[in-house]
Amino acid sequence: MRLSIEVPAAAKDPAALPRPEIQVIKTKIPGCVELRFPAIEDTRGYFAKIFHRPLWEDLGLCTQFEEEYLTHSVAGALRGLHLQVPPMQQDKLVLCLRGQAWDVALDLRRGSPTYGQHISRDLDSAASISALYLPVGVAHGFCVTGSEALFYYKVSSLYSPAHDAGVHWESAGISWPVQNPIVSPRDQTLLPLSDFRSPFNFKP
């Protein structure tokens, strides 16, 4: 006896599959976008999709990631402003999984209309599920504004200490919303923005 199984049209043609209703919000920094993910809730909790390759390709976002990280930070901690320089430069996706934080992106691409400028946003994991996508040449940092913050990262190249770089957190005109933050010795020794010689060129 042979079974006849009907294959759904969507399985034959991936383009026919439904796409998630991810909200894409452009920022003033070219290529840097906020992604807001809808949650499907029921009595058990919720479900949310944060990565959908076909949609990301349509948006021109990186889909090839090499590493993923988690960082847990306590109240008053400040991390940043970080990026990697060529040839280990990184596209980066940053998501706050738990807690409250103030998130910052700083454009360090020569020729960019927003070079040296930053964007910031308040994050509260209990209020929404959202991520920030940072293209190559945009540095990232954040400070914890609640009792803690758990961050998740996806990056497009492997971590390389020899190419790890950044800009001092006090040098870019950013009004951080915490006083006397907890900052690592390494972050305290980063160059000020005025002394940073950017190896990144903006590509419209």
Write out the residue ranges for each language-model feature:
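Non-catalytic, conserved peripheral segments adjacent to functional cores
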Residues: 2-128, 147-148, 155-204
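Short beta-strand His + acidic residue motifs that chelate non-heme Fe in jelly-roll/DSBH
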Residues: 104, 132, 140-145
